[in-house]
């Protein structure tokens, strides 16, 4: 006699590293088994609290239509990549074009790396440092500039002397001078970035504290990368991949990147950022962090194409009617009143007998909110997607004390979502 499959033993899903804590992916085998058991080809599957389009991805792979109401704008961005992964050749071409795009008197990559110029401790050749190791300030002075060492790559020393390509050297006076020097347009850069953050009640200094998590030269580099991502015209899947790569460059290019050890946790409470703990931190070149993000996203797409569910290319529509009666195969949205109205209008357009309506509502309960998740979501959404997307989040909770969601919060959220989606769900 065959035993029943256990949810606990189901193989966990995979996602990008940033979303492992914010919105973990569901087990793919469990999702597929539920879709196969409770729906048939041509039916529409609804995910009320999506975590990156994984339910919709599995539904499309099984010849179903899909409606995914994502839990946040960031998971909506991830779902764009999951449901319509770009061609890797197009992504590589877009990244190379960004690196070679003009920036002042040189290219974007060179302009971002110039403030991180240093000398090799062995051959004294000029090169671009990977990162500097600094100490956190103990007071309001310049103690954070008392760096301990720098990491860089010198191909000449590796060829002539051997050893590892990445080398370590002591901080010299020229490095300290460059670290103290602010870019000429530092105030303009901060103003443009400040406009991306919605204001939290009681947090007049919150946005400046968030920007202070990055050094002036890191801010200039990140703003230059973001300006190029948003300024160029390219396909939506490629732009989504570039934004997700930029998302994974934010934490490594901040004071939260501790040394040694793991990333510190961003926590906003009572309208202020809790400062990182004492110790050392890495000031990493933002372009190198962006390159690491591109490699992460590229590997994610390769794994997506070679996974058990295979690669799908969804045709996105605006509402449920476009899936039921049109040529679209999926609808993406963010959970909220507007999404509920779209579902209700789409459900009214179904034919007799419930044809064209949602046959299966499948998904995970919403992730319980806490201070760390909301702080990270607010900070990252404002950086990656801008002010309007970040304003959707319940940011008013950041101005008060620690968030303590009651135990019945998930059940209440599911109940509200199911009531809103009831007109679109077909009867058994």
Range-by-range predicted roles:
Residues 2-51, 55-56, 60-359, 366-403, ...:
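Nucleic-acid modification enzymes, centered on SAM-dependent nucleic-acid methyltransferases
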Residues 26-27, 409, 413:
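Soluble or luminal CAZymes and related metallo-dependent hydrolases
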Residues 355, 411-427:
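A short glycine-rich, Lys/Arg-flanked "PGG" loop and its adjoining helix->strand segment in the class I
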